[in-house]
Amino acid sequence: MKRVLTAVVAATALLLAGCGSGADDDRKPATGASDAAFPVTVGSVTMAERPQRIVSLAPTATEVLFAIGAGPQVVAVDDQSTYPADAPRTELSGFKPNAEAIAAQNPDLVVISDDLDKIIEQLGKLEIPVLFAPAAKVLDDSYREIDQLGTLTGHRSESAALVARMRGQIDKIVKGVPARADALSYYYEIDQSLYSATSRTFIGSIFSLFGLANVADAADPDGAKNGFPQLSQEALVAADPDLIFLADTKCCGQSPATVEARKGWSTITAVEQDRIVALDDDIASRWGPRVVDLVQSVADAVAKIPA
C-alpha cells in the first residue's frame, strides 16, 4: 500500500542510505557554465548566482541534475534517490521532509517534487530557495522541468541538449514500431495487490504513444482515484490484457514466474503467450532522462507481437 500512496502523492503534486556530505563540505565550482548568465528566475525562484550547494529531495530531479552536469553542485539527495550511484545519498526524506535537517546542509537551492508538510513555506522562512518540480503528467512536463533545472543551475545548454536528445530518441523508438489495425491491451502493475495506473497518469501517457489500451481505465473513468485504481482479480481476468508490465520487481519480488503462478491467471492472454514484461521499478516511476529506457522496453514488448 505504501507504493500506491507514493504514486498517488506524486500524481497529485506521480515510482519508490548512507550519509552524504555534511554542511561544512567544500564543493568545487561547477564547470561549463558562466556566472555571467545570472541572475536567473524560474517561477518564483530567483538565483543571484550559480548554486553550489543543491539539495535534491526528488529522485527524478537528482537524475536530471547529474545528467546535465550539475552533479558537482549537489551536496545531498534524499533516501529514494538511488541513481546515479555517486549521488550523495542521505537519510533526508522527500515524503517526510525535515526543514532543520535540510537547512543543516546549508543549501543555496532545494528541489522537491511534493510540498508535504508545507516544506516550501518552512524553508522560505529560512530564506532557502525551493524549486517545486511536481510529477509530470505528460512528456512535455518532463522536458520543461529539465529546462528549469538547467536554467537555475547554470547548465542551460546541457539541459537543452538533453531534451533534444530525449525527444529524438523517443520519436525514433515510437516510429520504429509498426502500426497495427487493432490496439493491444495491457495491464501495468504497481504492486501485487493489483493497484495500477490509468492513461491519465504520466506512465499511462508513455504507453499511449504506442496506441495501447489500458485495462485499468475502466476502474477510474472519472479520475476520482487520481489515476491509480485497485483492480479486482475478476475484472482483470475478464479484461484479458495482451501484455502485462510489472513495476514491482524490485520492491515486491514480482516476476513473470510469480505472475504465472497466480491462481486464476492462466487464462489471461499475456500469461498464455508469455508476454509478461519485468520493468525496473525506479525507471518506471520517474520522469527524467531514463524514461527513454522505459519507452524502449514498451516498444520491444509490442514489436514482438505480430501486427
Question: Could you say what each language-model-derived stretch is?
Answer:
Residues 35-41, 90-100, 221-233:
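Short helix-initiation/N-cap motifs at beta->coil->alpha
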Residues 1-60, 157-187, 300-307:
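Bacterial Sec-exported substrate-binding components of ABC uptake systems
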Residues 98-112, 128, 232-246:
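Proline-aspartate-enriched helix->loop->beta-strand connector
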Residues 53-115, 212-215:
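A short, structured surface patch at a secondary-structure boundary
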Residues 58, 114-115, 135, 190-192, ...:
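Short secondary-structure boundary segments
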Residues 119-195, 225, 274-307:
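Extracytoplasmic substrate-binding proteins
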Residues 117-125, 238, 242-262:
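A ligand-binding cleft/hinge motif common to bilobed small-molecule-binding domains
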Residues 79-83, 88, 200-227:
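Alpha-helical, coiled-coil/dimerization segments enriched in small aliphatic residues
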